[in-house]
Amino acid sequence: MVGREKELSIHFVPGCCQLVEEEVNIPSRRVLITGATGLLGRAVYKEFQQSNWHAVGCGFRRARPKFEQVNLLDSEAVHHLIHDFQPHVIVHCAAERRPDVVESQPDAASQLNVGASGNLAKEAAAIGAFLIYISSDYVFDGTNPPYTEEDIPSPLNLYGKTKLDGEKAVLENNLGAAVLRIPVLYGEVEKLEESAVTVMFDKVQFSNKSANMDHWQQRFPTHVKDVASVCRQLAEKRMLDPSIKGTFHWSGNEQMTKYEMACAIADAFNLPSSHLRPITDSPVIGAQRPKNAQLDCSKLETLGIGQRTPFRIGIKESLWPFLIDKRWRQTVFH
Protein backbone atom coordinates (compact mmCIF):
# COMPACT_ATOMS: atom_id res chain seq x y z
CA MET A 1 0.00 0.00 0.00
CA VAL A 2 1.26 3.50 -0.76
CA GLY A 3 -1.22 5.60 1.16
CA ARG A 4 -4.61 6.15 2.65
CA GLU A 5 -7.53 8.38 1.76
CA LYS A 6 -10.74 9.33 3.50
CA GLU A 7 -14.11 8.12 2.31
CA LEU A 8 -17.65 8.78 3.53
CA SER A 9 -19.82 5.79 4.40
CA ILE A 10 -23.28 5.35 5.88
CA HIS A 11 -23.56 3.39 9.14
CA PHE A 12 -26.91 2.00 10.23
CA VAL A 13 -27.67 1.18 13.86
CA PRO A 14 -31.12 0.60 15.37
CA GLY A 15 -32.95 3.91 15.35
CA CYS A 16 -30.04 5.85 13.87
CA CYS A 17 -28.30 6.53 10.58
CA GLN A 18 -24.85 8.15 10.61
CA LEU A 19 -22.52 9.51 7.92
CA VAL A 20 -19.02 8.48 8.97
CA GLU A 21 -15.64 9.47 7.51
CA GLU A 22 -13.29 6.50 7.36
CA GLU A 23 -9.74 5.97 6.19
CA VAL A 24 -9.30 3.42 3.39
CA ASN A 25 -6.16 1.88 1.99
CA ILE A 26 -5.03 2.82 -1.52
CA PRO A 27 -3.48 -0.10 -3.45
CA SER A 28 -0.03 0.60 -4.89
CA ARG A 29 -0.80 -0.65 -8.43
CA ARG A 30 -2.75 1.85 -10.50
CA VAL A 31 -4.86 1.14 -13.58
CA LEU A 32 -6.89 3.47 -15.79
CA ILE A 33 -9.80 2.02 -17.78
CA THR A 34 -11.32 3.95 -20.69
CA GLY A 35 -14.88 3.15 -21.67
CA ALA A 36 -15.40 2.01 -18.08
CA THR A 37 -19.15 2.59 -18.24
CA GLY A 38 -19.58 0.19 -21.17
CA LEU A 39 -20.17 -3.55 -21.09
CA LEU A 40 -16.51 -4.60 -21.24
CA GLY A 41 -15.18 -1.59 -19.35
CA ARG A 42 -17.40 -2.28 -16.33
CA ALA A 43 -16.11 -5.84 -16.14
CA VAL A 44 -12.47 -4.73 -16.50
CA TYR A 45 -12.90 -2.09 -13.79
CA LYS A 46 -14.48 -4.63 -11.43
CA GLU A 47 -11.80 -7.26 -12.12
CA PHE A 48 -8.90 -4.94 -11.31
CA GLN A 49 -10.62 -3.34 -8.33
CA GLN A 50 -11.33 -6.75 -6.78
CA SER A 51 -7.71 -7.81 -7.37
CA ASN A 52 -6.09 -5.12 -5.20
CA TRP A 53 -5.53 -2.51 -7.88
CA HIS A 54 -6.31 1.20 -7.53
CA ALA A 55 -8.69 1.43 -10.48
CA VAL A 56 -9.92 4.66 -12.05
CA GLY A 57 -12.53 4.42 -14.77
CA CYS A 58 -13.48 7.08 -17.27
CA GLY A 59 -16.46 7.43 -19.54
CA PHE A 60 -18.14 10.17 -21.51
CA ARG A 61 -21.70 9.71 -22.71
CA ARG A 62 -22.61 7.38 -19.85
CA ALA A 63 -20.43 8.95 -17.14
CA ARG A 64 -21.58 8.22 -13.60
CA PRO A 65 -20.51 8.84 -9.97
CA LYS A 66 -17.02 7.54 -9.07
CA PHE A 67 -16.01 7.63 -12.74
CA GLU A 68 -14.13 10.42 -14.48
CA GLN A 69 -15.99 12.12 -17.32
CA VAL A 70 -13.40 12.52 -20.07
CA ASN A 71 -13.77 13.16 -23.78
CA LEU A 72 -10.99 11.06 -25.30
CA LEU A 73 -10.99 13.37 -28.33
CA ASP A 74 -9.82 16.19 -26.03
CA SER A 75 -6.07 15.59 -26.03
CA GLU A 76 -5.44 18.14 -23.28
CA ALA A 77 -7.96 16.48 -20.94
CA VAL A 78 -6.42 13.07 -21.66
CA HIS A 79 -2.93 14.44 -20.96
CA HIS A 80 -3.96 15.86 -17.58
CA LEU A 81 -5.83 12.70 -16.55
CA ILE A 82 -2.90 10.41 -17.30
CA HIS A 83 -0.19 12.66 -15.89
CA ASP A 84 -2.19 13.38 -12.72
CA PHE A 85 -3.07 9.73 -12.00
CA GLN A 86 0.20 8.20 -13.26
CA PRO A 87 -1.24 4.72 -13.97
CA HIS A 88 1.01 1.70 -14.32
CA VAL A 89 -1.51 0.18 -16.77
CA ILE A 90 -4.14 1.60 -19.12
CA VAL A 91 -6.84 -0.66 -20.57
CA HIS A 92 -8.39 1.10 -23.56
CA CYS A 93 -11.92 -0.28 -23.94
CA ALA A 94 -13.58 2.83 -25.37
CA ALA A 95 -14.55 2.45 -29.02
CA GLU A 96 -17.35 2.70 -31.53
CA ARG A 97 -17.95 -1.04 -31.80
CA ARG A 98 -21.14 -1.17 -33.90
CA PRO A 99 -20.23 -1.92 -37.53
CA ASP A 100 -23.36 -0.36 -39.01
CA VAL A 101 -22.86 2.85 -36.99
CA VAL A 102 -19.25 3.06 -38.17
CA GLU A 103 -20.46 2.79 -41.78
CA SER A 104 -22.94 5.64 -41.28
CA GLN A 105 -20.62 7.86 -39.17
CA PRO A 106 -17.12 7.07 -40.49
CA ASP A 107 -15.38 10.29 -39.45
CA ALA A 108 -16.58 10.21 -35.84
CA ALA A 109 -15.75 6.50 -35.57
CA SER A 110 -12.26 7.03 -36.96
CA GLN A 111 -11.58 9.88 -34.54
CA LEU A 112 -12.37 7.61 -31.58
CA ASN A 113 -11.12 4.24 -32.81
CA VAL A 114 -7.93 5.56 -34.43
CA GLY A 115 -7.07 9.13 -33.45
CA ALA A 116 -7.88 8.89 -29.75
CA SER A 117 -6.16 5.49 -29.52
CA GLY A 118 -2.93 6.81 -31.01
CA ASN A 119 -2.93 9.80 -28.67
CA LEU A 120 -3.60 7.58 -25.65
CA ALA A 121 -0.67 5.36 -26.66
CA LYS A 122 1.61 8.39 -26.91
CA GLU A 123 0.59 9.65 -23.46
CA ALA A 124 1.04 6.16 -21.97
CA ALA A 125 4.54 5.94 -23.44
CA ALA A 126 5.43 9.33 -21.95
CA ILE A 127 4.92 8.04 -18.40
CA GLY A 128 5.99 4.43 -19.02
CA ALA A 129 2.49 2.97 -18.62
CA PHE A 130 1.57 -0.39 -20.17
CA LEU A 131 -1.31 0.13 -22.60
CA ILE A 132 -3.70 -2.68 -23.55
CA TYR A 133 -5.68 -1.73 -26.66
CA ILE A 134 -8.86 -3.75 -27.16
CA SER A 135 -9.26 -4.73 -30.81
CA SER A 136 -11.50 -7.12 -32.73
CA ASP A 137 -11.65 -10.34 -34.72
CA TYR A 138 -13.18 -8.18 -37.48
CA VAL A 139 -9.67 -7.20 -38.61
CA PHE A 140 -9.79 -10.54 -40.50
CA ASP A 141 -11.93 -11.40 -43.54
CA GLY A 142 -13.08 -14.75 -42.17
CA THR A 143 -12.01 -16.89 -45.14
CA ASN A 144 -9.19 -18.90 -43.54
CA PRO A 145 -9.66 -19.49 -39.80
CA PRO A 146 -8.35 -19.94 -37.21
CA TYR A 147 -6.23 -16.80 -37.23
CA THR A 148 -2.97 -16.40 -35.31
CA GLU A 149 -1.42 -13.10 -34.31
CA GLU A 150 1.01 -13.45 -37.23
CA ASP A 151 -1.69 -13.76 -39.91
CA ILE A 152 -2.12 -10.71 -42.12
CA PRO A 153 -5.35 -8.80 -41.36
CA SER A 154 -7.77 -8.01 -44.17
CA PRO A 155 -10.92 -6.34 -42.80
CA LEU A 156 -14.13 -6.55 -44.81
CA ASN A 157 -15.87 -3.52 -43.32
CA LEU A 158 -15.04 -0.04 -42.09
CA TYR A 159 -15.33 -1.04 -38.43
CA GLY A 160 -12.63 -3.69 -38.88
CA LYS A 161 -10.50 -1.16 -40.77
CA THR A 162 -10.77 1.43 -37.99
CA LYS A 163 -9.80 -1.17 -35.39
CA LEU A 164 -6.82 -2.26 -37.50
CA ASP A 165 -5.79 1.36 -38.03
CA GLY A 166 -6.17 1.83 -34.27
CA GLU A 167 -3.79 -1.08 -33.68
CA LYS A 168 -1.23 0.51 -35.99
CA ALA A 169 -1.62 3.93 -34.33
CA VAL A 170 -1.11 2.38 -30.89
CA LEU A 171 1.96 0.32 -31.78
CA GLU A 172 3.55 3.17 -33.76
CA ASN A 173 3.22 5.53 -30.78
CA ASN A 174 4.05 3.01 -28.07
CA LEU A 175 6.41 0.13 -28.84
CA GLY A 176 5.69 -1.48 -25.48
CA ALA A 177 1.91 -1.59 -25.87
CA ALA A 178 -0.28 -4.67 -26.28
CA VAL A 179 -3.16 -5.27 -28.68
CA LEU A 180 -5.83 -7.73 -27.51
CA ARG A 181 -8.16 -8.95 -30.26
CA ILE A 182 -11.47 -10.37 -29.06
CA PRO A 183 -14.74 -11.59 -30.69
CA VAL A 184 -18.41 -10.86 -29.93
CA LEU A 185 -19.01 -10.20 -26.22
CA TYR A 186 -21.81 -10.73 -23.73
CA GLY A 187 -22.14 -10.38 -19.97
CA GLU A 188 -24.12 -8.56 -17.30
CA VAL A 189 -25.78 -5.97 -19.51
CA GLU A 190 -27.70 -2.92 -18.31
CA LYS A 191 -30.04 -3.32 -21.28
CA LEU A 192 -30.39 -6.17 -23.76
CA GLU A 193 -29.26 -3.99 -26.68
CA GLU A 194 -25.82 -3.60 -25.10
CA SER A 195 -24.64 -6.89 -26.64
CA ALA A 196 -25.26 -8.56 -30.00
CA VAL A 197 -25.79 -11.78 -28.02
CA THR A 198 -28.17 -10.64 -25.28
CA VAL A 199 -30.26 -8.55 -27.69
CA MET A 200 -31.72 -11.82 -29.01
CA PHE A 201 -33.41 -12.64 -25.69
CA ASP A 202 -36.72 -10.93 -26.44
CA LYS A 203 -37.03 -12.84 -29.72
CA VAL A 204 -36.39 -16.04 -27.77
CA GLN A 205 -38.95 -15.22 -25.07
CA PHE A 206 -41.78 -14.10 -27.34
CA SER A 207 -42.40 -17.54 -28.78
CA ASN A 208 -45.81 -16.59 -30.21
CA LYS A 209 -44.02 -14.81 -33.05
CA SER A 210 -41.58 -16.46 -35.47
CA ALA A 211 -38.12 -14.88 -35.69
CA ASN A 212 -35.47 -15.16 -38.40
CA MET A 213 -31.99 -15.80 -36.98
CA ASP A 214 -28.68 -15.73 -38.84
CA HIS A 215 -27.29 -19.24 -39.32
CA TRP A 216 -24.43 -18.23 -41.64
CA GLN A 217 -21.83 -16.31 -39.64
CA GLN A 218 -19.81 -18.40 -37.19
CA ARG A 219 -19.27 -16.61 -33.87
CA PHE A 220 -17.43 -17.36 -30.64
CA PRO A 221 -19.39 -15.62 -27.86
CA THR A 222 -17.06 -14.55 -25.06
CA HIS A 223 -17.96 -13.42 -21.55
CA VAL A 224 -16.65 -9.96 -20.64
CA LYS A 225 -15.47 -11.20 -17.25
CA ASP A 226 -13.15 -13.65 -19.05
CA VAL A 227 -11.69 -10.85 -21.17
CA ALA A 228 -11.34 -8.73 -18.03
CA SER A 229 -9.44 -11.54 -16.31
CA VAL A 230 -7.14 -11.88 -19.32
CA CYS A 231 -6.44 -8.13 -19.22
CA ARG A 232 -5.54 -8.30 -15.53
CA GLN A 233 -3.37 -11.40 -15.97
CA LEU A 234 -1.61 -9.76 -18.92
CA ALA A 235 -1.00 -6.58 -16.91
CA GLU A 236 0.35 -8.45 -13.89
CA LYS A 237 2.63 -10.58 -16.04
CA ARG A 238 3.91 -7.47 -17.83
CA MET A 239 4.82 -5.84 -14.50
CA LEU A 240 7.18 -8.78 -13.93
CA ASP A 241 8.33 -9.21 -17.53
CA PRO A 242 8.80 -6.21 -19.89
CA SER A 243 8.92 -8.55 -22.91
CA ILE A 244 5.13 -8.97 -22.63
CA LYS A 245 3.94 -6.75 -25.49
CA GLY A 246 2.62 -6.93 -29.04
CA THR A 247 -0.53 -8.60 -30.34
CA PHE A 248 -2.59 -11.25 -28.54
CA HIS A 249 -5.86 -13.10 -29.16
CA TRP A 250 -8.52 -14.22 -26.70
CA SER A 251 -11.86 -15.88 -27.40
CA GLY A 252 -14.45 -18.28 -26.12
CA ASN A 253 -14.09 -21.73 -27.68
CA GLU A 254 -17.75 -22.57 -28.41
CA GLN A 255 -18.54 -22.00 -32.10
CA MET A 256 -22.13 -20.87 -32.73
CA THR A 257 -24.23 -18.97 -35.20
CA LYS A 258 -26.76 -16.48 -33.85
CA TYR A 259 -29.44 -19.11 -34.42
CA GLU A 260 -27.49 -21.63 -32.34
CA MET A 261 -26.90 -19.04 -29.62
CA ALA A 262 -30.62 -18.27 -29.52
CA CYS A 263 -31.44 -21.98 -29.23
CA ALA A 264 -28.86 -22.35 -26.45
CA ILE A 265 -30.41 -19.39 -24.63
CA ALA A 266 -33.86 -20.95 -24.96
CA ASP A 267 -32.53 -24.25 -23.64
CA ALA A 268 -30.82 -22.56 -20.68
CA PHE A 269 -34.14 -21.07 -19.57
CA ASN A 270 -36.31 -24.06 -20.56
CA LEU A 271 -38.05 -21.99 -23.24
CA PRO A 272 -39.33 -23.20 -26.63
CA SER A 273 -37.20 -22.56 -29.71
CA SER A 274 -39.42 -23.90 -32.49
CA HIS A 275 -40.40 -20.33 -33.47
CA LEU A 276 -36.77 -19.50 -34.32
CA ARG A 277 -35.99 -19.85 -38.03
CA PRO A 278 -32.39 -20.40 -39.22
CA ILE A 279 -31.36 -18.24 -42.20
CA THR A 280 -28.37 -19.76 -43.98
CA ASP A 281 -27.89 -17.07 -46.64
CA SER A 282 -25.18 -14.44 -46.31
CA PRO A 283 -26.70 -11.21 -44.90
CA VAL A 284 -27.29 -8.55 -47.56
CA ILE A 285 -28.24 -5.66 -45.25
CA GLY A 286 -25.72 -3.61 -43.28
CA ALA A 287 -21.94 -3.78 -43.13
CA GLN A 288 -20.31 -6.89 -44.58
CA ARG A 289 -19.30 -9.44 -41.91
CA PRO A 290 -16.59 -12.13 -41.96
CA LYS A 291 -18.06 -15.64 -42.10
CA ASN A 292 -15.64 -17.16 -39.57
CA ALA A 293 -12.95 -15.04 -37.92
CA GLN A 294 -12.03 -17.61 -35.25
CA LEU A 295 -9.02 -16.49 -33.20
CA ASP A 296 -6.18 -18.84 -32.29
CA CYS A 297 -5.49 -18.17 -28.59
CA SER A 298 -2.48 -20.47 -28.09
CA LYS A 299 -0.05 -17.57 -27.61
CA LEU A 300 -1.77 -16.43 -24.40
CA GLU A 301 -2.44 -20.01 -23.32
CA THR A 302 1.29 -20.75 -23.58
CA LEU A 303 1.89 -17.85 -21.18
CA GLY A 304 -0.54 -19.44 -18.73
CA ILE A 305 -3.09 -16.68 -19.30
CA GLY A 306 -6.77 -17.33 -19.86
CA GLN A 307 -10.25 -17.95 -18.48
CA ARG A 308 -13.36 -19.31 -20.18
CA THR A 309 -16.92 -19.40 -18.88
CA PRO A 310 -19.18 -22.03 -20.52
CA PHE A 311 -21.79 -20.23 -22.62
CA ARG A 312 -24.79 -21.88 -20.96
CA ILE A 313 -23.59 -20.80 -17.50
CA GLY A 314 -22.53 -17.31 -18.53
CA ILE A 315 -25.65 -16.49 -20.51
CA LYS A 316 -27.93 -17.65 -17.71
CA GLU A 317 -26.08 -15.44 -15.21
CA SER A 318 -26.37 -12.51 -17.60
CA LEU A 319 -29.99 -12.80 -18.70
CA TRP A 320 -32.02 -14.01 -15.72
CA PRO A 321 -32.97 -10.44 -14.65
CA PHE A 322 -34.49 -9.93 -18.10
CA LEU A 323 -36.96 -12.79 -17.94
CA ILE A 324 -40.41 -11.35 -18.62
CA ASP A 325 -41.64 -12.18 -15.10
CA LYS A 326 -38.49 -10.82 -13.41
CA ARG A 327 -37.87 -7.47 -15.11
CA TRP A 328 -38.92 -5.55 -12.01
CA ARG A 329 -35.81 -6.95 -10.33
CA GLN A 330 -33.46 -5.08 -12.65
CA THR A 331 -33.91 -1.85 -10.71
CA VAL A 332 -33.23 -3.62 -7.42
CA PHE A 333 -30.53 -6.19 -8.09
CA HIS A 334 -28.90 -5.54 -11.47
Swiss-Prot record:
Modified residues (Phosphothreonine): 309
Top-rank lineage group of the source organism: Eukaryota
InterPro entries: dTDP_dehydrorham_reduct, NAD(P)-bd_dom_sf, RmlD-like-bd
Residues in coiled coil: none
Pathway it works in: Amino-acid biosynthesis; S-adenosyl-L-methionine biosynthesis; S-adenosyl-L-methionine from L-methionine: step 1/1
GO molecular function list: enzyme binding; methionine adenosyltransferase regulator activity
Transmembrane regions: none
Binding site for NADP(+): 37-40, 60-62, 71-72, 93, 97, 159, 185
GO cellular component terms, A-Z: methionine adenosyltransferase complex; nucleus
Gene Ontology BP terms: one-carbon metabolic process; S-adenosylmethionine biosynthetic process
Segments of this protein annotated with the region Required for interaction with MAT2A: 319-334
Stated role: Regulatory subunit of S-adenosylmethionine synthetase 2, an enzyme that catalyzes the formation of S-adenosylmethionine from methionine and ATP. Regulates MAT2A catalytic activity by changing its kinetic properties, increasing its affinity for L-methionine. Can bind NADP (in vitro).
The family this protein is said to belong to: Belongs to the dTDP-4-dehydrorhamnose reductase family. MAT2B subfamily.
Self-association and partners: Heterotrimer; composed of a catalytic MAT2A homodimer that binds one regulatory MAT2B chain. Heterohexamer; composed of a central, catalytic MAT2A homotetramer flanked on either side by a regulatory MAT2B chain. NADP binding increases the affinity for MAT2A.
Matching PANTHER family: DTDP-4-DEHYDRORHAMNOSE REDUCTASE, METHIONINE ADENOSYLTRANSFERASE 2 SUBUNIT BETA
Protein name per the record: Methionine adenosyltransferase 2 subunit beta
Organism in which the protein naturally occurs: Rattus norvegicus (Rat)
Designated gene of the protein: Mat2b
